[in-house]
């Protein structure tokens, strides 16, 4: 593994941890030359899964798009990057468990919303506004009302 600071090839692993899903290994590394420390992640890569978009197009599944959407929804909240990464891992695991080679973007959005609802209500409403394509303020109020009723 190359050091991101000096480009040296020689690094050592200081710590390794498997996440709760058992699908990701987090490694803390140190460069033997410059002593810089950095984190790497190893994830299981599953076969090609395609996402069916609303307009019918098919795109190769890309976990970074899920993370990007979650990060936008969680902006200026107390949700940590670690919590966001865990949610992405959970969504990916749920997709893998189906064994399907295709999944609709709507199904992915539903999985993300379920996870965000447990993590942060503000992020949930933000994500819902994009996922459900809100056009009116009443749509926001309806989602907030649903959240309040669930408590």
From Swiss-Prot:
One Pfam family in the UniProt entry: Zn_ribbon_NrdR
Q: Which HAMAP family match?
A: NrdR
Q: Which domain of life is it from?
A: Bacteria
User: Cell membrane among the record's keywords?
Assistant: no
Tell me the protein's name: Transcriptional repressor NrdR
Which NCBIfam families does the annotation name? transcriptional regulator NrdR
Q: Which family does it belong to?
A: Belongs to the NrdR family.
Family annotation (InterPro entries): ATP-cone_dom, NrdR-like_N, RNR_NrdR-like
Q: Which UniProt keywords apply?
A: ATP-binding, DNA-binding, Metal-binding, Nucleotide-binding, Repressor, Transcription, Transcription regulation, Zinc, Zinc-finger
Zinc fingers, unnamed class: 3-34
Cystine crosslinks: none
What detail does the entry give on cofactor binding? Binds 1 zinc ion.
Q: Which GO terms describe its molecular function?
A: ATP binding; DNA binding; zinc ion binding
Q: Which gene encodes it?
A: nrdR
Annotated ATP-cone domain residues: 49-139
Q: Does the keyword Nucleotide-binding apply?
A: yes
Known function: Negatively regulates transcription of bacterial ribonucleotide reductase nrd genes and operons by binding to NrdR-boxes.
The record ties this protein, via PANTHER family, to:
TRANSCRIPTIONAL REPRESSOR NRDR
Q: Which GO terms describe its biological process?
A: negative regulation of DNA-templated transcription
The cofactor required is:
Zn(2+)
